[in-house]
Amino acid sequence: MAQLGPRRPLAPPGPPGTLPRPDSRAGARGTRDRVDDLGTDVDSIARIVNSVFVWRVVRADERLKIFRCLTVLTEPLCQVALPNPDPGRALFCEIFLYLTRPKALRLPPNTFFALFFFNRERRYCAIVHLRSVTHPLTPLLCTLTFARIRAATPPEETPDPTTEQLAEEPVVGELDGAYLVPAKTPPEPGACCALGPGAWWHLPSGQIYCWAMDSDLGSLCPPGSRARHLGWLLARITNHPGGCESCAPPPHIDSANALWLSSVVTESCPCVAPCLWAKMAQCTLAVQGDASLCPLLFGHPVDTVTLLQAPRRPCITDRLQEVVGGRCGADNIPPTSAGWRLCVFSSYISRLFATSCPTVARAVARASSSDPE
């Protein structure tokens, strides 16, 4: 078999079907000293690895290829991956993939011996038939489709992912371009779940729809701000002074570049929403934040903002007045639709957020499981 790199010891064997948790934990990076073999069924592994959004090349040569991905820790992944002990990374899963073609196995074309490592602690060994599609802008990113997976005998020694040198810079800027595309209300607008005020996941298409400013209105936002969607503006207007834990955006990764930190993804994510809406589903919100931003949405001063859609009965609409309204004393103040557009994200960008943001992933999973199709 081709060399797989530096080794580390395996965990001692346990009873069939058990997955003993290693006792030792090493370093702030959340790595452990031992690795356990998974007894998970092939179908479950196939669903998990084929759900990965993007794989990033760690290193590659004629004998060995190593890939890595980061993704939200979904319910299926919880069956094979232990949480990262770092609180800032506990909601995510890191997967390493080692691919070799040992001569002794006499594998047919496009077939590989694969080692999957989940959060560097559990591994699964398999023979896989592989199809790869490279990113149009860089050979360092690709999507991988695994077929005809069958469990394989683990090697006597295992490579150590902690020895790999990992890039810390993005290779593509997926959110740098014009990813907000003006749209009309889609078919079946009620087949959706709310991600934030004026932001929805459309179940039939698997795409995000959200209300956002155009570039002219966006130029009036505070310097350095990248966010343009309605939920972000409402949060700036209504969040209480000083903020709280709920006001801060949750941890995000950049699943398109396999990076643990990305301010671009965090700021642009449609999960950003007013604090009281996010933690209490409150739809009437006092203006406690930056009132100077109110003219971006209302033609007259307002002291209260009202979100007009109940979170449990969402419906995508291209009429802004069906999403948000304002009040000044006893007077109703409609929003100014000039400069605002209902936009749709491409399927690719939508999946980027669904695999980078735990809030979006959780909302989509919950809605998909209850969708009668």
Curated annotation (Swiss-Prot):
InterPro entries: Herpes_UL16/UL94. Residues 1-35 are annotated as: Disordered. GO terms for cellular component: host cell cytoplasm; host cell nucleus; viral tegument. Changing C221S: No effect on the interaction with UL11. Residues 9-19 have a biased composition (Pro residues). Plays a critical role in cytoplasmic virus egress. Participates in the final step of tegumentation and envelope acquisition within the host cytoplasm by directly interacting with the capsid. Upon virion binding to target cell, a signaling cascade is triggered to disrupt the interaction with the capsid, thereby preparing capsid uncoating. HAMAP family: HSV_CEP2. This is Cytoplasmic envelopment protein 2. The lineage of its organism: Viruses, Duplodnaviria, Heunggongvirae, Peploviricota, Herviviricetes.
